[in-house]
UniProtKB/Swiss-Prot annotation:
<keyword id="KW-0694">RNA-binding</keyword>
<feature type="region of interest" description="Disordered">
    <location>
        <begin position="84"/>
        <end position="121"/>
    </location>
</feature>
<keyword id="KW-0779">Telomere</keyword>
<keyword id="KW-0238">DNA-binding</keyword>
<dbReference type="GO" id="GO:0003677">
    <property type="term" value="F:DNA binding"/>
</dbReference>
<dbReference type="InterPro" id="IPR051958">
    <property type="entry name" value="Alba-like_NAB"/>
</dbReference>
<dbReference type="GO" id="GO:0005634">
    <property type="term" value="C:nucleus"/>
</dbReference>
<dbReference type="GO" id="GO:0003723">
    <property type="term" value="F:RNA binding"/>
</dbReference>
<feature type="compositionally biased region" description="Acidic residues">
    <location>
        <begin position="100"/>
        <end position="113"/>
    </location>
</feature>
<keyword id="KW-0539">Nucleus</keyword>
<dbReference type="InterPro" id="IPR002775">
    <property type="entry name" value="DNA/RNA-bd_Alba-like"/>
</dbReference>
<comment type="similarity">
    <text>Belongs to the histone-like Alba family.</text>
</comment>
<dbReference type="GO" id="GO:0000781">
    <property type="term" value="C:chromosome, telomeric region"/>
</dbReference>
<protein>
    <recommendedName>
        <fullName>DNA/RNA-binding protein ALBA2</fullName>
    </recommendedName>
</protein>
<comment type="function">
    <text>Possesses DNA- and RNA-binding activities. Binds to DNA with relaxed sequence specificity. Associates with the subtelomeric TARE6 repeats.</text>
</comment>
<dbReference type="GO" id="GO:0005737">
    <property type="term" value="C:cytoplasm"/>
</dbReference>
<keyword id="KW-0963">Cytoplasm</keyword>
Length: 211
């Protein structure tokens, strides 16, 4: 199957998923890509793995005949941090110096400047860690499919699929956003519900049930 797990270059039919973004944005991109390509690749790293699975399931329920291949692997991630421990030690040593050593300081200024320059160049520390990664390949082309491959999943039943166009997905996204905000009259309903539970009538009913 295409889609190497070792390459870091993004392919034209690949969608890299972040756990912070809205899943419907990626679903929209996937449906648009299926108009040009027979298969797409959904990829994610670390916390985004659960988002990759979620997006793949949403796409499979909006497009018919999608065969799925799941790839799990690890890759090295380099973290760069600044090490200021050397500068802190120099600051402590300067505080401990007495007034009798002022004459010696003039002679040591050049040496200290050279040492500080060396420390400034060596302040960056690199850490190499391994992070889990996932790639899910969704394919419409049945001729190039090896159904015995590890990680293969057959298409969903047509009864479970509701085919949608990119325009319909955008409408679904706007509807969900409106529904989350409460829509028309949503704020009034929430305020009514809050006031109802804060009234004495509700408290009296709770007292009667206890007795």
């Amino acid at each position: 199957m295409p889609g190497s797990t070792k390459s870091d270059t993004k392919l034209e039919n690949e969608i890299r998923i972040s756990y912070k973004s809205d899943a419907l944005d990626y679903v929209y991109k996937a449906i648009v890509l299926f108009e040009t390509y027979d298969e797409i690749i959904l990829s994610g790293v670390g916390k985004a793995i659960s988002s990759v699975v979620n997006v793949a399931e949403m796409v499979k329920r909006r497009a018919k005949g999608l065969h799925q291949f799941t790839k799990l692997y690890e890759k090295e991630h380099v973290i760069k941090r600044e090490d200021n421990s050397g500068l802190k030690k120099n600051a402590k040593n300067e505080d401990k110096k007495s007034g009798d050593e002022e004459e010696e300081e003039e002679e040591e200024e050049e040496d200290e400047e050279n040492n500080k320059n060396k420390e400034a160049n060596n302040r960056t520390v690199e850490f190499i860690t391994t992070v889990p990664c996932m790639k899910i390949i969704l394919s419409k082309n049945e001729d190039k499919i090896d159904k015995n491959e590890i990680g293969y999943q057959k298409p969903l039943d047509e009864k479970e699929v509701n085919v949608m166009t990119p325009e319909q997905i955008l409408k679904e996204k706007s509807y969900r956003r409106r529904y989350r905000r409460g829509g028309r009259g949503g704020d009034r309903f929430r305020s009514y519900r809050r006031n109802y539970y804060e009234t004495s009538m509700w408290n009296n009913r709770r007292y009667e049930k206890r007795n």
